[in-house]
Amino acid sequence: MKRKNLLKILVLFILAGSIVNAEYLKENGEIYYEMPYFEVKSKVKEADAKSFKSFEGRNKTVMDSYYGKDNKNVYLLGKKLKNVSPKEFEILNEDYIKDDKNIYKVKLEEALFFSSNEINTKKISVDGLDVKTFRTLENDKEIETNYFGDKNSVYYIYENIDKIKEADRNSFKILDYYIAKDKNN
């Protein structure tokens, strides 16, 4: 577990340090993903320039600027995310994304290899979780948090998506990154 967390931290440092100026570009009716640090500029295969949208500038998660979508596909670091629909696509945090039907875990380590044009995702299923209403819980501090909720329950995401069984969805309030309260606790 410690090794896995260390690897994840290392990957995030590499991404943050070396792809800090990376961006999607529209040129001559084509979409490109540019990483100036590596002096790499590659065409995003199958991307539709007319409907393409980058998530850069959204500033909800560290990963926002690495994602883009068009009317057919979702892309991470210029590579197509396999089986992810652009319909209602949302970046939940560094490891998890969702579309209109499913929640997925993204293998960030896989995204760093430049040999493939597609990135595999792992579909996540949690008993009772309503994907349509699953969202990041709002907080007064405007901090990125690992607390999420659907219409009925509260969840905490770290390595997995865990339901907080005794949490009251209606009174749940985030106090800080790891600290929250509800009427029961």
Name every feature range the model reports, one short phrase each.
Residues L12-V20:
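Hydrophobic h-region of N-terminal signal peptides that target proteins for export
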Residues I19-N185:
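Non-catalytic tandem-repeat scaffold regions and their flanking low-complexity/translocation tails
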